């Protein structure tokens, strides 16, 4: 989905060990943390649509074409022999790989001791082959007691920079931190109140997210696919399916060990350079953790469908959806932190800690 060459052949063609390692990190010849700039000679700029669409396809052609699953999350767009566009479900496009993954999930479900986790693994294994992820997303939200967490499948659409329609495959294996999760649990009860307190017109907060949403902390032990490309994700808000969000809410997963590593090795050195000395006392892990957490909480708030009923907000915003959604989450997260500080529900630190 991200690169058109065979992975093993591509990496073996790079003689310099450090460059080869950098290419493996980026899942291709483009620097993902520098605007997808090519760092190997012989490669052009990365296609905005990655491998989801034909490289020679223009937006105008796509807009006027008529074919099934045109804006599908779980399909590739191809050309037929006559040059016409058509879609191929992931379950067909990656059939051999998904059959292997599905079989492994079934075997894992037989070993699972937690019944809800067993059910999720079974449904997810079926979803990989049916291309219908709704039932398994619902089952994932129903899991509450599993100490091991698996997030797997086509999930985020950031890789599709052309339209933001299509999701890329990824996987996480996580271990739940029970002590930290208990500390975070109290915030879930405030989500309906936070939704109603949004500083916007009533029409933009009429949709009430499911009250079954939860906040949990985890240690991540494995990344693969999109979540492992370029940088490492430190927090997740899932599922992305608007139907699940409205019925079940979302789960906010805070990847504590990854967050700690980012704070110690990246954020603090940057702060020591950019932040004036008298403000550095406000650089705290608690504030960093909370800002990240409420950023993810903010993804689940607001409306998911357009006011005129024409479709989803994500579909209407197209390729701009991801950037606007991330900006919304940043600002709304700080708004919620301030509200909870004023209520006395957050007791760690000062408002300056969270803003600095």
Question: How should each PLM-predicted stretch be described?
Answer:
Residues 281-290, 321-328, 348-356:
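Secondary-structure capping and boundary motifs in well-ordered enzyme cores
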Residues 290-304, 329-330, 334:
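Active-site recognition of the HExxH zinc-binding catalytic motif
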Residues 303-327:
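Post-HEXXH active-site segment of zinc metalloproteases
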Residues 114, 322-339:
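An active-site-proximal "capping" alpha-helix that borders the catalytic cofactor pocket
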Residues 87-280, 284:
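Contiguous, non-catalytic segments that form substrate-binding/exosite surfaces or channel walls
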Residues 263-274, 296, 300-312:
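Active-site-adjacent bridging/hinge elements
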Residues 1-112, 116-120:
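N-terminal helix-rich structural modules
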Residues 334-356:
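Long, well-structured alpha-helical subdomains associated
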């Amino acid at each position: 989905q991200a690169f058109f060459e065979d992975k093993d052949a591509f990496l073996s063609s790079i003689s310099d060990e450090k460059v080869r390692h950098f290419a493996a990190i980026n899942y291709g010849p483009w620097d993902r943390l520098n605007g997808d700039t090519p760092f190997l000679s012989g490669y052009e700029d990365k296609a905005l649509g990655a491998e989801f669409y034909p490289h020679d396809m223009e937006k105008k052609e796509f807009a006027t074409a008529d074919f099934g699953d045109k804006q599908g999350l779980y399909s590739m767009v191809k050309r037929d022999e006559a040059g016409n566009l058509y879609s191929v479900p992931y379950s067909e496009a990656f059939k051999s790989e998904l059959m292997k993954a599905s079989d492994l999930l079934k075997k894992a479900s037989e070993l699972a001791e937690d019944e809800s986790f067993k059910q999720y693994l079974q449904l997810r294994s079926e979803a990989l082959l049916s291309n219908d992820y709704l039932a398994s997303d619902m089952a994932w939200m129903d899991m509450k007691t599993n100490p091991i967490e698996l997030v797997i499948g086509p999930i985020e659409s950031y890789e599709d920079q052309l339209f933001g329609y299509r999701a890329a495959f990824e996987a996480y294996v996580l271990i739940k931190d029970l002590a930290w999760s208990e500390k975070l649990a109290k915030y879930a009860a405030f989500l309906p109140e936070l939704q109603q307190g949004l500083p916007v017109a009533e029409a933009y907060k009429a949709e009430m997210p499911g009250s079954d949403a939860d906040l949990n902390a985890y240690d991540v032990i494995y990344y693969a696919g999109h979540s492992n490309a370029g940088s490492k994700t430190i927090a997740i808000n899932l599922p992305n399916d608007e139907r699940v969000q409205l019925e079940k809410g979302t789960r906010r997963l805070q990847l504590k060990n990854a967050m700690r590593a980012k704070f110690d090795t990246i954020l603090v050195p940057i702060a020591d350079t950019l932040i004036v000395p008298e403000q550095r006392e406000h650089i705290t892990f608690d504030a960093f953790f909370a800002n990240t957490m409420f950023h993810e909480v903010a993804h689940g708030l607001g409306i998911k469908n357009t006011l005129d009923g024409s479709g989803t907000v994500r579909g209407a915003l197209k390729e701009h959806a991801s950037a606007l959604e991330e900006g919304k989450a940043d600002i709304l997260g700080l708004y919620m932190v301030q509200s909870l500080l004023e209520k006395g529900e957050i007791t760690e630190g000062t408002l300056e800690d969270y803003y600095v």
